[in-house]
Amino acid sequence: MRLRSFAFLGFMLLVAMAPSMASAQPQPLDRIVAVVNKDAIMQSRLEDRVTQVRRQMASRNVPAPNEADLRRQVLDRMILEQIQLQMAERANLSIDDTQLNATVRGIAEDNGMSMDEFADALEEDGMSLASMREQVRREMLLRQVQQSQVASRVNVTDREVERYLDQQGETADTAYHLAHILVSVPESPTPEQVEQAQAKVRDLYRQLQNGANFAQLATAESDGQQALSGGDLGWRRGDQLPSLFADVVPTLSNGEVSEPIRSPSGFHLVKLIDTRGQQGEQKRVVTENRVRHILIGTNPNRNDQQAEALARDIRQRIANGESFAALAQEYSDDDGSALDGGELGWTRPGQMVPAFEDAVKALDVGELSQPVRSRFGYHVIELEDRRRQDVTRDAQREQIRQTLFQRKVSDEMEAWTQEIRSGAYIDNRLEDGRQ
């Protein structure tokens, strides 16, 4: 059974995959292929990653470059990953088992499986549950670093949202399938470095004009985050285009590659793979539920059976007339609502985990649920009120806010990766053949 893609993972997942199986053949003496500040990256790790990336590329029908180019690209991603893991260590960031368990359980639920079924499916895909857990832990840690260092720098104001809402035009109703090549320049580059990058991007552009395969060239030569996916950026609505490309992409024909585009991070080539029309915004009316809950989770002193038993006891006490709010303040493990007596306010579809939402849908106003199991623990839920609400304008604003936020994060991410790379000691022995 093949698992659905773990879409929540960040861009480093492709090269963060653990090897699926250890070779039974005798291994040659391991060597250092790169030193990143105080840490070494060994050749065995690099070869494991290269093997995994080749499998990933084959499954996505992305043409693989030659071995040397692929190893160089994978090592470059491993170096960037190592810098971020070192930043996490210095900042004392960590992922505890409770967070990890909830995330892994959520992945299983998103694939419609129990944990036992999920473990079996992983085995069929050649990966143990233990190795998958460590992969997810590492990726969550990288996301923490990126969140603290990049997303925290980005802010979208209400004025920006309203201005965009007033100004968005026809491009918002068109979706574009894009691919991208980046030829980067260092932070504060010299004129010679800029000239070298410009010469390289011009050469790549000429090759593409002469019929070179964009995906293969991106995999071999791009410094962009999606290089190992053939530079594929996927489908983007017009209002989701990176600000750098927003004026260029609508002028391209399907299959056309833009001329080099200059940015502080380097030179970009963008290919428009395909275009499709989008339906206009439809009126959106949803059912909102005002709910409160008490969450009983597991911890080192309370196993799953004990958590369920406590939740049932609390539910019975409420049914017997005790105060829901008082019991929530005393027992609930949801720090965000416990002090408010478990109040979650008005909730809309998609805001809660599926098990919680399904339970709420089945309740009548004023009714108390039986304990409901989710990835977070056991919930005792009371439906306080229900209403129909037109959220069209709110949905538009939130969509635009997320679009502008992701656009800013994308722009900031390129600058940040250059910044952390420039600030690190990197001895890449693969580049000069010393490995």
From Swiss-Prot:
Keywords attached to this entry = Chaperone, Isomerase, Periplasm, Repeat, Rotamase, Signal
User: What is its EC class?
Assistant: isomerase
Which GO annotations describe the biological process of this protein?
Answer: Gram-negative-bacterium-type cell outer membrane assembly; protein folding; protein stabilization
Which superkingdom does the taxonomy of this entry point to?
Bacteria
Cellular component GO terms, alphabetical: outer membrane-bounded periplasmic space
Q: Does the keyword Signal apply?
A: yes
> Which intervals of the chain form a coiled coil?
none
Gene3D superfamilies linked: 3.10.50.40, Porin chaperone SurA, peptide-binding domain (1.10.4030.10)
Q: Which residues form the signal peptide?
A: 1-24
Recall the GO molecular function terms of this protein's record.
Answer: peptide binding; peptidyl-prolyl cis-trans isomerase activity; unfolded protein binding
Catalytic reactions of this protein: [protein]-peptidylproline (omega=180) = [protein]-peptidylproline (omega=0)
User: Taking the first listed entry, what is the main subcellular location of this protein, grouped into a coarse class?
Assistant: periplasm
Where the record annotates domain PpiC, the positions are 173-274, 286-385
Q: Where in the cell is it found?
A: Periplasm
EC numbers on record:
5.2.1.8
Q: What is known of its domains?
A: The PPIase activity resides only in the second parvulin domain. The N-terminal region and the C-terminal tail are necessary and sufficient for the chaperone activity of SurA. The PPIase activity is dispensable for SurA to function as a chaperone. The N-terminal region and the C-terminal tail are also required for porin recognition.
Q: Which PANTHER family match?
A: CHAPERONE SURA
Query: What role does this protein play?
Result: Chaperone involved in the correct folding and assembly of outer membrane proteins. Recognizes specific patterns of aromatic residues and the orientation of their side chains, which are found more frequently in integral outer membrane proteins. May act in both early periplasmic and late outer membrane-associated steps of protein maturation.
- Extract the HAMAP family matched here: Chaperone_SurA (MF_01183)
Q: What is this protein called?
A: Chaperone SurA
Q: What is the lineage of its organism?
A: Bacteria, Pseudomonadati, Pseudomonadota, Gammaproteobacteria, Oceanospirillales
